[in-house]
């Protein structure tokens, strides 16, 4: 089916929900470790407490992808999942800062991450469903744009409340600035998704009669689950060559990102602010500045998102992604040479450029290599190459750090940030071997 060209406003409407999704992710990334600590978790417990994200991504995304490929009702194909995920995500976000125990917070995080994945997974397929191949670059870049805005707002909101004079804590010791931010985040998440659901329509399956006949076949729950698993296995077995090549790019890219997310704040405290222990007042100052740095790279992300789309049209998606990953690599490696907090902000420019490309170019490249009837399932399987390295890192990096650097080496976080830069450089080199079948550029 020849799809009509959509206006920039229409593409913005269909991507606006990502602002809410990233608002939820941003609040989680910036605050969950601290929430666990306030509730009494030990530092050594935190990596395992973070397993909710990758495990739910590993399980939920391919299942939702396969289910959404088979769905068609009055809301469409993907939008029912946007809405269901948003409702449960908003509930979890609203309750999270009122947690009274580590177990309660951990349980809510599992609900939150599963629900966010329900909303997020169909968004990638939504772009491929709605847009002609010539517009997919701008479609995925528009998602990056709203991701950048959502993350920037989420990172800044607790600081806004603090400077507005909000102080105090809940009965569990969680700052009111965090509590208010999560509750606002719950509202933003739901409203952003509702905007996309209400302003964007979907195209029915090309052969609706055949689609309805297949869906009408009686299936028990066991057969349904079995068929979904069989479809996931089939998708992995029949994975297009481009997807296999991108898998290695994603593996090294996300190892680099996880090194940054887990260790950048600590590296800022010890290396730039000169803290000698977590009890040192400079440690907290460094952690706060690390949050500001993350806000900066989020701002850079939405500022450069559309520039990357234009450059991809002028050159190629592979060229843009390679250069962007190298920018991120240089940004992380350069932290070693920086001891001034303001110069540290410059490193985030490179990271922001890389992040804008990471959120768009691999998906634009992938969408051109996928059969239209299986885009949802393949987008879910593609998520494996993000969550598997995260699971491996959560389970092994603590032991690796102790083996290489010991427990008391405050340079270890800096070295792990630099390792993230090396991983990103490896990812950039691997882009050269990717075959972009949907790009007219070389």
Describe the role of every protein-language-model region.
Residues 1-9, 100-107, 118-119, 123, ...:
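Intracellular loop-helix junctions on the cytosolic face of multi-pass helical membrane proteins
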Residues 42-52, 176, 180, 274-299, ...:
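Loop-to-transmembrane helix entry
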Residues 59-75, 303-316, 401:
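Helix-to-loop junctions at the C-terminal end of transmembrane segments
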Residues 82-101, 326-339:
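C-terminal ends and interior cores of transmembrane alpha-helices
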Residues 92-96, 100-119, 343-357:
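Hydrophobic core of transmembrane alpha-helices in multi-pass small-molecule transporters
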């Amino acid at each position: 089916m020849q799809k009509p060209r959509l206006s920039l406003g229409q593409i913005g409407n269909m991507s606006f929900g990502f602002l809410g999704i990233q608002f939820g992710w941003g609040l989680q990334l910036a605050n969950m470790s601290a929430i666990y600590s306030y509730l009494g978790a030990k530092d050594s417990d935190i990596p395992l407490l973070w397993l909710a994200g990758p495990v739910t991504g590993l399980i939920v995304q391919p299942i939702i992808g396969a289910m959404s490929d088979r769905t068609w009702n009055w809301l469409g194909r993907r939008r029912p999942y946007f809405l269901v995920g948003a409702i449960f995500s908003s509930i979890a976000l609203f309750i999270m800062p009122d947690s009274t125990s580590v177990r309660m917070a951990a349980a809510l995080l599992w609900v939150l991450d599963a629900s966010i994945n329900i909303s997020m997974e169909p968004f990638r397929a939504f772009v491929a469903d709605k847009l002609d191949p010539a517009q997919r670059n701008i479609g995925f870049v528009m998602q990056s744009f709203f991701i950048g805005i959502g993350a920037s707002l989420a990172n800044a909101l607790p600081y806004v409340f603090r400077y507005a004079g909000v102080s105090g804590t809940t009965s569990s010791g969680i700052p009111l600035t965090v509590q208010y931010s999560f509750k606002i985040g719950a509202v933003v998440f739901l409203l952003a998704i509702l905007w996309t659901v209400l302003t964007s329509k979907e195209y029915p399956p090309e052969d609706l009669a055949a689609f309805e006949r297949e869906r009408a076949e009686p299936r028990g729950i066991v057969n349904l689950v079995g068929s979904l698993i069989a479809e996931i296995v089939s998708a992995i077995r029949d994975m297009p060559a481009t997807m296999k090549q991108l898998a290695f790019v994603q593996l090294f890219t996300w190892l680099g990102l996880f090194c940054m997310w887990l260790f950048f704040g600590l590296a800022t405290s010890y290396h730039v602010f000169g803290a000698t222990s977590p009890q040192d007042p400079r440690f907290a100052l460094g952690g706060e500045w690390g949050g500001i740095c993350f806000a900066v790279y989020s701002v850079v992300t939405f500022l450069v998102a559309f520039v990357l789309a234009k450059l991809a049209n002028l050159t190629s998606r592979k060229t843009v992604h390679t250069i962007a990953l190298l920018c991120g690599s240089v940004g992380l490696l350069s932290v070693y040479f920086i001891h001034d907090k303001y110069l540290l902000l410059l490193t985030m420019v490179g990271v922001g450029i890389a992040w804008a490309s990471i959120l768009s170019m691999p998906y634009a490249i992938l969408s051109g290599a996928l059969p239209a009837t299986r885009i949802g399932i393949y987008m879910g399987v593609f998520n494996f190459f993000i969550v598997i390295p995260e699971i491996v890192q959560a389970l092994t990096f603590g032991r690796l750090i102790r083996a290489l650097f010991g427990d008391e080496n405050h340079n270890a976080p800096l070295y792990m940030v630099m390792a993230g830069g090396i991983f990103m450089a490896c990812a950039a080199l691997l882009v050269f071997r990717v075959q972009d079948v949907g790009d007219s550029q070389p």
